[in-house]
Amino acid sequence: MTPTRRVVTGIVDGIDVLESDGPAPNSLDIGPVAVSEVWWSERGHRTVGDPCDRTTPGFPLEPPPGGASARIIRMPGIPDGADLDSTWLRVDGDDPSTPGMHATDTLDFMVVLDGSVVLGLDDGERVIGPGEYVVQRGTRHRWRPADEHGWTYFVAMLRPDPTVSPVDGSVRVHSTGDAPVRRVITGAPVLDGAAEVHLANGGFTMTDMWHTGGPLRRAAQGGDPDGPWALEPTAGGAWFRQWTLEPAPPSDAGWHRTRTIDLDIVLRGRVRLDLPGGITTDAGPGDVIVQRGTDHRWTALGDETLVVATVMFDAVW
């Protein structure tokens, strides 16, 4: 797999800049499996200027307590004549009686970019297709390809920190709604259906997949937002969302700045990112933009609706 293109913005000496634009440096090919690590965080108390890349060797499965990782992973399809039970992705320490079945002490935000995958849970299997979301809350699970074609997915893994103080972050129990986006939320019971919270404003929509409600103390923590809609996460929290934008001329009203680290993954369409001073870059499907507290605006290009998955982490300046 070609290493994932990653665009990183930042603030240098008070000026909004495009810090880098190129392949994610921590990339790994293991036979037919390819991994690009697009972001890594060692701690829960984040600043917008924190480094994006891990400097330690190896590819640890889980980040440290309070930390988070984000990766794009490419998996092969089912080989000709293969027994399906042999195609489950094996993980060190998984259940030998149920190949690939494992649990991590993480809250995982996952979206399929292309292809299809089977998610195996204790209550059965579900096929997850392109543009569909999974919120994996520390439960037992496993993965295998759905067909002979490969599949690519993005996953952000958030590691709880049991020492943080609980915060009332205005979240409520998640439920099925009528937003035109499918999400699967693991737990007891599993929720599989349309997302509930969906904001539409002209040519822009925002669909909420998950809010942690504050610093992450447990992998199962969070739910749907409760109360007035807000752009930024609760202090110390993280949000998982999808937003769409219809093609239109650039607008001065589109400029904005948030006190967050945003991981934006283009699922469909093309987008132009503008920063002050005439800095601009275009991005397309599979590209990742790490947006770190800069003033910026988005413009959808061409004639196709822009669809972007985003993970927003609260941060300080």
Predicted regions and their residues:
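N-terminal leader/capping segments at the start of a protein or of a new domain
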Residues: 1-51, 171-220
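Residue-level signal for well-ordered, solvent-exposed loop/turn and beta-edge residues enriched
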Residues: 15, 116, 193-194, 270, ...
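Extended, compositionally biased flexible segments
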Residues: 30-66, 73-76, 206-236, 241-244
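Conserved short histidine dyad/triad with adjacent acidic residue
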Residues: 53-56, 68-104, 138-140, 160, ...
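Glycine- and acidic-residue-biased ligand/ion/polar-headgroup-sensing regions
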Residues: 97-99, 105-122, 259-276
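A short hydrophobic beta-strand segment most commonly corresponding to one strand
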Residues: 108, 133-142, 148-166, 262, ...
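Structural motif
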Residues: 116, 140-142, 270, 295-297
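Short acidic-glycine-tyrosine-enriched beta hairpin
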Residues: 122-138, 277-293
